[in-house]
Amino acid sequence: GWIEASSRYSFNKSHAVSYAICAYWSAYAKAHFPLEFYCNYLKYSGGKPDPQREVKELVTDAKSNDIFIHPPSLEYLNEETSVINGKVYFGLKNIKSLGANTIISIKENVKDARSLLASEIWCWYDFLILISRKINKTASRALISSGVLSELKTSRQKMLYEFDTFEKLSNKEVEWAEENYKNFNSLVDLLRSLARPRKEGGGVTNKNRLGIVNDLAQQLENPPVSLQDDPEWIVRTEENYYGVALTYSKVDSVDVSRGNTTCKDILNGKKGNLSIVVTVNEARKYTPIKGKNAGKDMGFLEVEDATGSMDGVTLFYDAWYKYKNMLYNGNNILIIGKTSGGKRDGIIVDEIFEL
């Protein structure tokens, strides 16, 4: 009988104790071993009910503690999220379009290519010639677009443009490029030399290909579009591959000079009249049922900037109805307001400007 009676309360108590212990050790790890804390929580986020939301919240929270999560490293080719030389790196498995066999192929081809390099220092030109055609197109584009190759100090747009150009060469022309690439410092120089008949030391087999390769070289020298990376494009691309932006925040694509504070400053207790440039993550409507504002809609915002996120942004009735149409997810706005009385990390909104 006592076992049955005990079951009415022991289950809840045991869970309460378990959660308390987990919360204590998690807080201890976050305070004393922050890199390992974020690394392991990110690594096992797949077991959460909403993994993508969990990852985004962890990356944003880490940012507010001056810990930045990086794309996987070409140098180490870590498969899992890892702490390497005092930094947290996502793993290749975190890139959505890369399967297990593709990752094996990437690692094997990078290892083979390293043995051919004159030094241990990689450049984009080395990767393009020695590796890009040996793994599938999707994998090459993913490595470029997701930032794995960013340590090669070439813009992602330029890498994608040169990769697409190199893909247009025939297999014979690629063989010539692999045999002769050490004689050149760039793809355009290689193509200029390639665009000669074989009897003159070039790599084309007919006049038609001669014209095509020359045109490719000309397009590399005078690209039709800018090959500089746009922060907004990088944000969208990284969200596509990881579910969260790592290199930039959405506010990096707009002028933030009109702001006088950041999310991190406010979370750390900054007071007074404030202006802050943020991205809207979520807007929630709330209708009080009691008090002097009963029945009048108001709103609460979760916002984010390059330093972190906060959710204590309040719009009372007049402000909510005046600005609610610009409070959609992903929109960059300038908030003018003041810190709320009792909340250490809250803002009462006076004005909002769309950027």
Predicted regions and their residues:
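Noncatalytic, beta-rich nucleic-acid-contacting surfaces in large DNA/RNA-processing enzymes
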Residues: 1-355
